[in-house]
Each structure stands twice: as structure tokens, then as C-alpha cells.
């Protein structure tokens, strides 16, 4: 049996900041479009009861990826509780080639979660074979985390892609009233377990994760001017790292966490700068006519994408991280490269989220929501979160990178914007 304490250490760091600042009105996923073209799978209701529905969390995770289409419980030909009870033919006859079964039982001051992933068609050699199995003991507080762990392992086994269901998102909420209506919040990727990292009477913008998941950089206007703040998620300590004359915004950590790229109008025109992650003297990268903003690093740290209106209208450019000439990439802004360096996600001229294959140059529109902004990729490149306008406010939207699955994460206590997906938070 495996105890999850070792795996939740970084999550615990994130929760430490918000332990006394729980944000009661969480954002929760509301499905907009399903995944009919995805791979069918069955997550059989786990035996036993717990405060959280483990099998539903696993099914939701797999659906959110766009790779799988979990069938309804009512469609299941049987509800086995062990591999020995599985009738492979009953499942293969309805097009299901893999099922997840399990149980959750009280254990000490928490619960034991056990699961098995079963091959129903013999792809592994024998129909009914156990593809993988595992068991965890978690406290009540970490039940959802335990379920996300099952999801990550099942997802990786079936796709050969590392799962990202134990990651988190940071975002800004502008509440409907109160003396400090602006808040930086952090939550599980699906909107649960939300906590406040910082609140202010003045606007907060553009949170960005450090690559180790232990710091957030963001823009704060709390001193009546735009400043870049880096906050440690373990201690809660905050440090102003840029407070230059003019506007300072759009921070982005380098892949090794040692540097920050950002936009500043310290010399009158908005340009891209790079400095140490703890502050210091910045190096100017862009120059000339036009405003330059929204820097984003390539995975190897050798180049930077940014948005510029130097040609008369905003579009994405790419340049060496040491400076020099820039090459137009396309789109309108908010670019990010996937961790494997193969895909570019950005906003196009119609304010839609698009992805572009950097090898072929082929682009695909993933969203048609109104005024899409700030797309952020999951660390495995499978899911994208972004903000859009609904009615008079901003909400978060989730879309799978293949465009199959779309969902909303509306906030009930204010406008939600500037989402940023965390790096992996486990080894």
C-alpha cells in the first residue's frame, strides 16, 4: 500500500498560503460540448462510500482530456468489483476495450483507494488481463487528490502521455463588491479546493507560475502603480521585483526559474525586458516602433514569443532570448508553446483560441467563444484553459487540445480571468 504523503508535498505548499483564506464560491466545470468521437471507456462505480465519489472524479478527468468518452453507468453490462468478476466479452460487445474498477474503504483517519485497469479485448494478450493496479491511503482532505492520482496513472497507461490531473490553476477574481474585490486564487485544475493567495483593493493581473510550482509572479496595482510581485507559496512572503516608471506587466518565468521576462514602458514605449527572478537590472530585448508585450518562453529557454503591434495591428513574434531581430509567427496575441515544442497556442484575429503545428504551420480553431483571452496549456499539452466573456462578465473555459471537449468554469462571486496552468506538481 502506498501512502500519498510523498506526492502531495507541493500541493500542501500551495494550500499553506490559503489555509486561512478559503474562497467559498468555487469555479466548477460545466460541460458545454461532449466527446462523442473520443475513445469509449468505462469507470465502474467503486465499491464502498466516501465523502467524494472517486469513480465520478476519475471519469470526469478522463472526459476532460478529450481523449476518452466514459459511458454512463446505465449503459454498463455489469458492475464487477474485481478482475475475476469481469466478463470481457460483455464489454467488448459494446465497444469498450478497457474498464476501471475499484473500491474505497475507511482506513485509520482516512480511506484506502484501490483500483484495477482491465483489458477487455486482449490487446495485452489475454482478455480480462489486469493492465495495472494500485492502492493508496489518503486522509479525507486528500480524497480528490487520490482520485486524480488514479486518473493520471490510467491516462498514462492508455495513452503513453503523462497525466496532468494533479495540477492546479491560478487566476484572478474580481468580486462583486467588498473593500478588497481583487483576488489571486489557486485551485485544482477542475476548480475544486480553491484558496486565496492574495487580495487587494486595487487590480491584480497576469499570474504566472514558477517552473517548480512554488512561486507566483503577478501584476499588482496596490500602490497606485503597476508593480511585478513574486510570492512564495510556502511562506506567503511577497517581494516587489519591478516597480519602474510607467507600466510593468505580463511576467513570465524562464524554464529554469532563474529569470523573468516582462513588459515595461519605463522608457516611454512598451518593450520586452528580462531580469533575474528576484529582481535586478533588466535587459531590454525589443526596440523600435510599436508596443511589445505578453512574453512567453520556449521550452528550452532559447527564444521568446511576444505580442507586438509594430506592423500596425497586434500579432505574435519570436526572437532569441538574448535579443536581436524578431520573426512574425501570426495570430493576434497571448502565445504559448507546448512543453514538447511542437505546438503553439494563441488568440487569433477573431479572438478565438487556435493551435498551430510548428512543423507544418497548419492552424486549427479550438474555441468560438466570445472574446477569448489568456490561453494557458496544461503541462502535457492535452488541455487548455482560457478566459472569455459571457454576458457582462468574464469566465474561464476549458477545451481539450483536439477540440473534442469544451466546458465552462463560471465563478459565482465575480468575474474570473487571467488563468495560468501550473507545471507538474509531483515527481
Swiss-Prot record:
InterPro entries: 6-blade_b-propeller_TolB-like, PD40, Tol-Pal_TolB, TolB_N
GO CC terms of this entry: periplasmic space
Source species, domain of life: Bacteria
Keyword annotations: Cell cycle, Cell division, Periplasm, Signal
Location(s) in or outside the cell: Periplasm
Pfam families listed in its UniProt record: PD40 (PF07676), TolB_N (PF04052)
Keyword NAD: no
Range of residues in the leader sequence: 1-23
GO BP annotations, alphabetical order: cell division; protein import
NCBIfam families with a match to the protein in the record: propeller_TolB
Family annotation (PANTHER family): PROTEIN TOLB, PROTEIN TOLB HOMOLOG
Subunit structure: The Tol-Pal system is composed of five core proteins: the inner membrane proteins TolA, TolQ and TolR, the periplasmic protein TolB and the outer membrane protein Pal. They form a network linking the inner and outer membranes and the peptidoglycan layer.
Protein family according to the UniProt entry: Belongs to the TolB family.
Record function comment: Part of the Tol-Pal system, which plays a role in outer membrane invagination during cell division and is important for maintaining outer membrane integrity.
HAMAP family linked to this entry: TolB (MF_00671)
Name recorded for this polypeptide: Tol-Pal system protein TolB
Organism: Haemophilus influenzae (strain 86-028NP)
The encoding gene: tolB
Amino acid at each position: 500500500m502506498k501512502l500519498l504523503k510523498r506526492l502531495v508535498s507541493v500541493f500542501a505548499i500551495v494550500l499553506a498560503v490559503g489555509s486561512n483564506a478559503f474562497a467559498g464560491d468555487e469555479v466548477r466545470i460545466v460541460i458545454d460540448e461532449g466527446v462523442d468521437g473520443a475513445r469509449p471507456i468505462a469507470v465502474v462505480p467503486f465499491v464502498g462510500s466516501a465523502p467524494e465519489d472517486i469513480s465520478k472524479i476519475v471519469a470526469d478527468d478522463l472526459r476532460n482530456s478529450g481523449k476518452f468518452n466514459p459511458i454512463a453507468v446505465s449503459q454498463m453490462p455489469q458492475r464487477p468489483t474485481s478482475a475475476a468478476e469481469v466478463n470481457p466479452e460483455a464489454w467488448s460487445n459494446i465497444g469498450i476495450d478497457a474498464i476501471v474498477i475499484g473500491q474505497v474503504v475507511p482506513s485509520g483517519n482516512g480511506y484506502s483507494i484501490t483500483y484495477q485497469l482491465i483489458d477487455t479485448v486482449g490487446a495485452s494478450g489475454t482478455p480480462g488481463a489486469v493492465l495495472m493496479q494500485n492502492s493508496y491511503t489518503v486522509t479525507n482532505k486528500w480524497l480528490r487528490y487520490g482520485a486524480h492520482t488514479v486518473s493520471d496513472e490510467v491516462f498514462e497507461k492508455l495513452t503513453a502521455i503523462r497525466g496532468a490531473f494533479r495540477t492546479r490553476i491560478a487566476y484572478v477574481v474580481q468580486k462583486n463588491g467588498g473593500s478588497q474585490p481583487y483576488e489571486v486564487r489557486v485551485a485544482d485544475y477542475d476548480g475544486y479546493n480553491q484558496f486565496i493567495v492574495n487580495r487587494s483593493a486595487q487590480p491584480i493581473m497576469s499570474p504566472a507560475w514558477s517552473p517548480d510550482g512554488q512561486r507566483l509572479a503577478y501584476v499588482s496595482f496596490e500602490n497606485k502603480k503597476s508593480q511585478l510581485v513574486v510570492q512564495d507559496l510556502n511562506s506567503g512572503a511577497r517581494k516587489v521585483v519591478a516597480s519602474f516608471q510607467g507600466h510593468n506587466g505580463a511576467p513570465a518565468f524562464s524554464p529554469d526559474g532563474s529569470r523573468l521576462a516582462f513588459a515595461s514602458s519605463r522608457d516611454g514605449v512598451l518593450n520586452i525586458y528580462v531580469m533575474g527572478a528576484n529582481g535586478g537590472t533588466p535587459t531590454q530585448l525589443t526596440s523600435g516602433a510599436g508596443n511589445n508585450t505578453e512574453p512567453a518562453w520556449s521550452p528550452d529557454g532559447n527564444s521568446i514569443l511576444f505580442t507586438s503591434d509594430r506592423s500596425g495591428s497586434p500579432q505574435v513574434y519570436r526572437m532569441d532570448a538574448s535579443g536581436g531581430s524578431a520573426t512574425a509567427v501570426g495570430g493576434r496575441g497571448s502565445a504559448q508553446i507546448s512543453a514538447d515544442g511542437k505546438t503553439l497556442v494563441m488568440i487569433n484575429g477573431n479572438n478565438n483560441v487556435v493551435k498551430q503545428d510548428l512543423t507544418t504551420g497548419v492552424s486549427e480553431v479550438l474555441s468560438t467563444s466570445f472574446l477569448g483571452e489568456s490561453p494557458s496549456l496544461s503541462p502535457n499539452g492535452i488541455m487548455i484553459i482560457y478566459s472569455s466573456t459571457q454576458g457582462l462578465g468574464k469566465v474561464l473555459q476549458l477545451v481539450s487540445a483536439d477540440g473534442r471537449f469544451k466546458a465552462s468554469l463560471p465563478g459565482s462571486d465575480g468575474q474570473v480571468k487571467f488563468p495560468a496552468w501550473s507545471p507538474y506538481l509531483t515527481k
